[in-house]
Amino acid sequence: MAARPQQPPMEMPDLSNAIVAQDEMGRPFIIVKDQGNKKRQHGLEAKKSHILAARSVASIIKTSLGPRGLDKILISPDGEITITNDGATILSQMELDNEIAKLLVQLSKSQDDEIGDGTTGVVVLASALLDQALELIQKGIHPIKIANGFDEAAKLAISKLEETCDDISASNDELFRDFLLRAAKTSLGSKIVSKDHDRFAEMAVEAVINVMDKDRKDVDFDLIKMQGRVGGSISDSKLINGVILDKDFSHPQMPKCVLPKEGSDGVKLAILTCPFEPPKPKTKHKLDISSVEEYQKLQTYEQDKFKEMIDDVKKAGADVVICQWGFDDEANHLLLQNDLPAVRWVGGQELEHIAISTNGRIVPRFQDLSKDKLGTCSRIYEQEFGTTKDRMLIIEQSKETKTVTCFVRGSNKMIVDEAERALHDSLCVVRNLVKDSRVVYGGGAAEVTMSLAVSEEADKQRGIDQYAFRGFAQALDTIPMTLAENSGLDPIGTLSTLKSKQLKEKISNIGVDCLGYGSNDMKELFVVDPFIGKKQQILLATQLCRMILKIDNVIISGKDEY
């Protein structure tokens, strides 16, 4: 009888993700966790799911594009209301579960962080690219070939953009300032402040010119402070050459306005981080006072110390004391007696702004205070608002200042917040033009120019790349079509008119006449976008599209319900 062949030993299953349970008879059985709840999408189904998610996000903010774009009202879980048409703000405040939708939010944030404007356009363009990619995938073209084709088309589009852009830098500073002013107005066209865009554009340009580093051609936004206050109207907003403190003088009898003394070049400020109080032991201590004499001796000691501190300040020549810490009523009274107006409980960041603005030094000890460490400003005054008891201190500079404050007013908090966001976008546009003075023309003119160049190149391509090039060109057409649609125009008719005009007249500044000026010449209307902003839009949208096209599997692990 032949021997039975020996069976290989059975491998033990992986029980690391399992639990042992017993039935009602006490018999053991094994439950493998996660298997029932785990979901998986792959292949075309996964890509469709991603692109539909991107399309749904883009459809929400699409109607906010352009000067005729509409606003959105966003209500947070705790009931806070935000009204805005800023793409980055809309997306950041939306509750999104889908992973691809979250990538679009990050895309918008990246554009906002890097450029500050064009956050809506970059999401609309990325969604349009993904829509075109889906059509090509359904025709049987491999996603990587589509992504490679899009990359090549993006390079061509950017090179065309570089050919057709204009440089607005001028040897005359006044002319360059005028260009910056008109560019700032373009960015404010779609915002809530569009009726006062002259005032806000002026604020943005003045702020950037005051603080910019002319040698490096850069602007430090930390030197431009934004301060909003509910009350008044948007037209009451103004630029302060200096710093605004949400404080008032420490004593109600102190003067409401401090002006330079005769023969002085300005009001002298002592900026202190040391408290106005007698010195204390560093270690834990206990002070026993057993008689009235001892208490009076202690009180006299405290008064002497306060007088020493005030003498140090006056000896240095200070007119006003700005202190990071508080001081008690006795110190406050002595400051009033010695004609030294003071401000207490000023934050560390505000102290830095004051020091930069007044060219002073922050002093940690009274003994270190000297004349050369004092800050100088043209005046300090207290401003009241309406019938409320709200007060603000304004430290103002009449000479060239290193810090500015944009003081924004509005009838309610939502308007103030949206006005601040609009002003931030405008500041970013001006900053970008200071860094790189090249501009492309708005109203979809740049996109139409790039679309025509990419379509022309598509006809020269022999392989599958031609489909990707045409898809990229059609995605670029989405921007002018959306602008036309949001302006109440016929999208397809408007696009075909723009393309025929650009081809016929061989100029790249023909765009959508969103505001009904009767002219499509964006150069004449001076509707411009910074070149670096438009270039960044193309690059970021193409990179995101490539990343999403490379995903073919989505595995969602379920939650344990045991």
Swiss-Prot record:
It comes from the Eukaryota. The keyword Nucleotide-binding applies. One of its GO terms (molecular function) is ATP hydrolysis activity. Keywords: ATP-binding, Chaperone, Cytoplasm, Nucleotide-binding. Its main location: cytoplasm. InterPro entries: Chap_CCT_epsi (IPR012718), Chaperone_TCP-1 (IPR017998), Chaperonin_TCP-1_CS (IPR002194), Cpn60/GroEL/TCP-1 (IPR002423), GroEL-like_apical_dom_sf (IPR027409), GROEL-like_equatorial_sf (IPR027413), TCP-1-like_intermed_sf (IPR027410), TCP-1_chaperonin (IPR053374). Gene3D superfamilies: GroEL, GroEL-like equatorial domain, TCP-1-like chaperonin intermediate domain. GO terms for cellular component: chaperonin-containing T-complex. One of its GO terms (biological process) is protein folding. PROSITE patterns: TCP1_1, TCP1_3. It is found in: Cytoplasm. Heterooligomeric complex of about 850 to 900 kDa that forms two stacked rings, 12 to 16 nm in diameter. Belongs to the TCP-1 chaperonin family. PANTHER family: CHAPERONIN. Molecular chaperone; assists the folding of proteins upon ATP hydrolysis. Known to play a role, in vitro, in the folding of actin and tubulin. In yeast may play a role in mitotic spindle formation. This is T-complex protein 1 subunit epsilon. It comes from Saccharomyces cerevisiae (strain ATCC 204508 / S288c). The gene is CCT5.
